[in-house]
Swiss-Prot record:
Pfam families: Med27. Belongs to the Mediator complex subunit 27 family. The gene is MED27. Component of the Mediator complex, a coactivator involved in the regulated transcription of nearly all RNA polymerase II-dependent genes. Mediator functions as a bridge to convey information from gene-specific regulatory proteins to the basal RNA polymerase II transcription machinery. Mediator is recruited to promoters by direct interactions with regulatory proteins and serves as a scaffold for the assembly of a functional preinitiation complex with RNA polymerase II and the general transcription factors. It is found in: Nucleus. This is Mediator of RNA polymerase II transcription subunit 27. GO terms for cellular component: mediator complex. It comes from Aedes aegypti.
């Protein structure tokens, strides 16, 4: 629908209303002081005549624009909104222009969605008309490793003054027993190649007697501190894409406790702080620190 003739007619209508308003304003003011004393009535009539001529000119132009308009071929279907003109409540009458605007917006939305549907059905965004059935290879999961894989990984790790032993009390998941010289012993509970729990005890404490011993903490505070730090390191070295590297890094870090009671703190230079040796080992340099000195 061409809206240019309608906009042109509305523009001339505004000009006509403005010129008529000037006529009534001039009549309301009457003869003014600016007309002077001599011939003021004649000047007033001349001014009024010019305004009326402008009204006639605007009226002819407006009629010409009206004649250029083509009536709609069919009446607009407004459904139940056509009865709003019969409503006397001003609050309900205010809904009419908003509903008309909503209908126009809905028509444009339907038109644009139709064009978009036609373009999308042309399949122009695909490189091929055939569906590729090749699926991406799934990454191996670290907790689904076979027992042979775990045995080969642990068997390839060798450090002096450290003994590694694998037991399987439940036939599936392995428990790695670590003995570091005559300093401490630890039980690392594995689920595939994923470290789930670490228990640290003294060399003279029971750890291999039964499964329940793997979940009880040490009676010595120093080894309880080491166990807490081991849990932090377990989370730090966790890597779902490189689980073998995570286990190697954790065992390398844990072996640094070989000098638990020998090396002083790297920061304060003391062996004891609050009656405890340096129980923290730096995750990169493996240097010993007291828990209060590591910050």
């Amino acid at each position: 629908m061409n809206l240019e003739p309608i906009n042109n007619a509305l523009s001339h209508l505004r000009m006509l209303r403005s010129s008529v308003g000037q006529v009534f304003e001039t009549l309301g003011n009457g003869v003014r002081a600016e007309h002077g004393e001599e011939g003021k009535e004649q000047k007033f009539l001349q001014e009024l005549q010019e305004l009326l001529n402008g009204v006639n000119s605007n009226l002819r132009e407006f009629e010409t624009c009206i004649n250029d308009l083509t009536p709609p071929q069919a009446p607009f279907n407004l459904a139940n909104t056509a009865y709003l003109s019969l409503e006397t409540n001003l609050e309900r009458q205010a809904l009419y222009p908003h509903l008309v605007q909503s209908y126009k917006w809905h028509d444009k939305l339907h038109e644009y969605s139709t064009f978009a549907s036609v373009l999308l059905q042309q399949n122009s965004l695909k490189r091929s008309y055939y569906t590729n059935t090749k699926r991406r290879r799934s990454l191996p999961s670290s907790h689904l490793a076979t027992p042979q894989t775990v045995d080969n990984l642990i068997g390839s790790i060798h450090f002096p003054n450290m003994n590694l032993k694998i037991v399987r009390p439940f036939m599936t998941n392995a428990i790695l027993h670590i003995t570091i010289a005559r300093v401490l012993r630890a039980a690392v509970i594995l689920k595939g190649l994923l470290i789930e729990w670490v228990t640290v005890k003294g060399f003279d404490e029971s750890l291999l007697d039964g499964v329940d011993e793997h979940w009880t903490v040490s009676r010595h505070q120093v080894f309880r501190k080491v166990q807490d730090h081991a849990h932090s390191a377990m989370l730090h070295f966790f890597s779902p894409t490189l689980p073998d590297l995570a286990i190697r890094s954790f065992i390398t870090w844990f072996r640094s406790y070989l000098t638990l009671f020998a090396d002083p703190c790297k920061k304060c230079g003391k062996h004891l702080h609050n009656t405890l040796p340096p129980t923290w080992r730096d995750l990169r340099t493996l240097e010993p620190y007291h828990e209060e000195c590591k910050q």
